[in-house]
């Protein structure tokens, strides 16, 4: 589990980001946001080259506490109930020591949305972040907490939401046709 561990982007991640950059080359963006995690920042830099990027700690992946750095098998063996809740009933998940609950993540992302005035922005923005964080962000913008359990996002996938009048519409979700 990575969680909030700071790691470098893998060679596969670099390849996927470069391919996504080609796909998005003609898109004019008004703002680009990225998690401050090294792997997300490297992804954003590969995709958006010399464009200015606003880094935010609020876009970090959910903190996994003492699960970070362990394998799925280790965690499932040590904490079977919490492992189940994490994947099947995330809002009942109690984080390990130093970890973050899904409610905490939701509050953090709502703070980001409010601080950056995401809902009232016009134009095109990009957000480079992490799987669980992006799933939560999409659920918040869709105003559908239950949606979190029904979407999955692959690494370096493309999702597009259209925001208007304090509502959002999913135009594209988890597009990986660029790789």
Question: At which residue positions do the language-model features occur?
Answer:
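Loop-to-helix element that buttresses phosphate recognition and phosphoryl-transfer chemistry
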Residues: 1-43, 97-110
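Generic beta-sheet signal
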Residues: 121-131
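Short amphipathic alpha-helical/adjacent loop interface patches that line ligand
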Residues: 17, 79, 90, 109-113, ...
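Acidic, low-complexity terminal tails and accessory targeting/binding regions
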Residues: 49, 56, 62-74, 118-123, ...
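Catalytic DNA-binding helix-loop module of base-excision-repair DNA glycosylases/AP lyases
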Residues: 133-139
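Short glycine/proline- and acidic residue-enriched helix-loop micro-motifs
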Residues: 82-104
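Phosphate-coordination/substrate-recognition cap region in phosphate-metabolizing enzymes
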Residues: 18-83
């Amino acid at each position: 589990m990575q969680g909030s561990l700071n790691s470098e982007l893998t060679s596969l991640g670099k390849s996927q980001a470069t391919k996504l950059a080609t796909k998005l080359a003609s898109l004019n963006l008004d703002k680009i946001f990225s998690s401050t995690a090294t792997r997300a920042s490297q992804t954003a830099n590969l995709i958006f080259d010399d464009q200015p990027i606003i880094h935010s700690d609020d876009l970090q992946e959910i903190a996994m506490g003492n699960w970070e750095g362990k394998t799925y098998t280790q965690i499932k063996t040590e904490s079977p109930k919490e492992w189940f809740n994490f994947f099947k009933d995330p809002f009942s998940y109690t984080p390990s020591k130093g970890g973050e609950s899904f409610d905490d993540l939701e509050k953090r992302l709502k703070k980001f949305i409010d601080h950056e005035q995401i809902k009232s922005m016009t134009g095109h923005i990009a957000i480079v972040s992490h799987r669980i964080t992006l799933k939560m962000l999409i659920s918040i913008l869709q105003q559908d907490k239950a949606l979190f359990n029904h979407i999955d996002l692959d690494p370096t996938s493309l999702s597009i939401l259209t925001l208007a009048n304090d509502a959002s519409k999913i135009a594209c979700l988890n597009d990986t046709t660029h790789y």
